[in-house]
């Protein structure tokens, strides 16, 4: 049985202070239980995450790198995918995707803008993760427009057990050509690559994000 099956979330949040630390603790605890489950089942590293909106969990994720063989399947990323799949139009998730489906995506109430805010669907959400996010996950959190992040352990804590997230943050501060982990070659065929930027800029019906 999944460890998280024993964790209950209050269904009626009207009678509780959802902004209190005492209430929020349950979400960090659940993220930690998800992390432990991932370790015990051999799915991936010791990381779990939950996404909360208005005091309720709308998405859960675990590190599943070992299970899938996909190196980007970190807890925060899988939680974002889970949350978006729950609040998004299911038509967007299948092979029958077509441009008209964009009309089905929610947008601000009363907005005269016919273009849905497709890439901002996790605005108003909080993410809880048992460990400090790595640079990739932090970027995903930015792109998902999540408002707040709560995490338990520090980068130095996970560094001690073999995860080099701290080194990545240090490396990212260096200029492109001085980075140590990966060789970077900026401006390679830049003028040709700019054609894609021009195509986007010239597309009159583009969906901004």
What does each model-found stretch correspond to?
Residues 81-103:
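Internal, charge-rich low-complexity segments
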Residues 41-45:
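A short helix-loop-beta-strand connector motif used in the catalytic cores of GNAT acetyltransferases and
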Residues 1-40, 98-123, 133-209:
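Zinc-dependent deaminase
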Residues 128-132:
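Short His-Asn-centered micro-motif
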Residues 46-55:
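Short beta-strand scaffold segments in enzyme catalytic cores
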Residues 64-78:
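A short, polar/charged loop-to-alpha-helix boundary motif
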